[in-house]
Regions:
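Mature catalytic core of soluble alpha/beta enzymes
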Residues: 1-351
Length: 351
């Protein structure tokens, strides 16, 4: 693998996706490569009265394993976990009774939703507009057909019909009321949800008096402040060609986020064809790309979530051009030849 830097003019493109579950972890030691192999154990451990020892909780939420590590009180950690459960039961497309489920089942009728649901949809629509629909949260009509757990490939006819219902312009938000103009359209917030949740959790913990925390939502890592000794958190980047414990790089992060998306996260093979979980809203099929993994360092996990998978549709060169032109991001891209490419100012350390 080689390190290369690109600096080209910006090209705007985007993609939509189902929820990703890449493993990327915070390190409380200087060597992220070593710590990546030993994530905190399930449950919460006892912390010091003054928050001098870390409190950690690990649960299966958002279709992945999440680990929250804070230097604070047990009450703050419990509040963060409860907040995660709230989002699981509000944003999930598949949880019966969730806001998104009710919107999709309403056949075009207006639906009253939580403030957070209206907010995330409003933010998501801004990405849809900026990308002229290449990022489109109404990809749910297609993503609901694919089953990457059981390895189910939809019929071509079903995909062709489903993509006719992809159009973000048919989504309206008025206060906390959401309506789809197409009765057969379906929303899928997988391309932005974990980023939004990570940013929300940081705000919640800060309000609880927590000044140091690392939130690993499985591919979306957000950190609050620095480590207790004042040094940055180190976030490891998984090797897309290795095991979940193998890392290719680490990046220091203070009060920001590192978001990684990879083709290998969910896939299956049928009749010799490999299908990836990242779907192209223009075709309804998995994206065709030379990018295997992309990682973004950014202040906003919401931005990082939306853009990390956008890079797949763009391809390596155009993706790095976009990152170099957008001062919100620094990035790392691994292509299908195994080469690692960094943005011009990327502080990633390669291993």
């Amino acid at each position: 693998m080689t390190r290369r830097v690109f600096a080209r003019g910006m090209m705007l493109a985007a993609a939509s996706l189902t929820t990703s579950s890449l493993l990327s972890a915070c390190s409380t030691a200087a060597d992220a490569a070593t710590e990546q192999a030993s994530l905190p154990a399930t449950g919460a451990n006892d912390g010091g009265a003054e928050g001098t020892e870390p409190l950690t909780a690990t649960e299966f939420l958002f279709d992945t394993v999440i680990t929250l590590t804070i230097y604070g009180t047990q009450e703050a950690l419990d509040a963060a976990i409860e907040r995660c459960r709230f989002f699981e039961n509000t944003f999930s497309r598949t949880v019966e009774g969730s806001d998104v489920w009710r919107i999709n089942e309403a056949a075009g009728q207006p639906v009253e939703v939580a403030r957070e649901t209206a907010d995330i949809i409003t933010q998501a629509l801004a990405y849809c507009e900026a990308s002229e629909g290449l990022f489109d949260i109404t990809i749910g009509s297609v993503s609901s057909l694919w089953d990457f757990k059981e390895g189910v490939r939809p019929a071509d006819e079903a995909i062709a019909e489903a993509i006719t219902h992809i159009d973000y312009r048919g989504v309206s938000v008025e206060g906390t009321t959401v309506q789809l103009s197409d009765p057969q359209a379906k929303i899928d917030l997988g391309g932005i949800a974990k980023g939004y949740i990570a940013d929300d959790l940081k705000q919640l913990l800060a309000e609880q008096g927590v000044e140091s925390a690392c939130l690993n939502l499985g591919g979306n890592v957000a950190v609050l402040g620095t480590k207790p000794d004042g040094s940055p958190w180190n976030v490891g980047i998984q090797d897309p060609n290795g095991s979940a414990q193998d890392v290719i790089a680490a990046v220091p992060c203070t009060n920001g986020s590192v978001v990684t998306s990879g083709l290998y996260e969910r896939q299956f093979t049928e009749e010799g064809v490999l299908y990836y979980h990242i779907l192209d809203p223009r075709t309804g099929y998995p994206v065709v790309t030379d990018v295997v993994s992309s990682s973004l360092l950014t202040d906003s996990s919401t931005d990082g979530d939306a853009y990390a998978t956008m890079l797949f549709l763009m391809g390596r060169d155009e993706a790095l051009a976009l990152v170099n032109e957008d001062d919100r991001f620094e990035g790392l891209v691994v292509d299908n030849a195994g080469e690692i490419t960094l943005s011009a100012q990327a502080p990633f350390e390669l291993f």
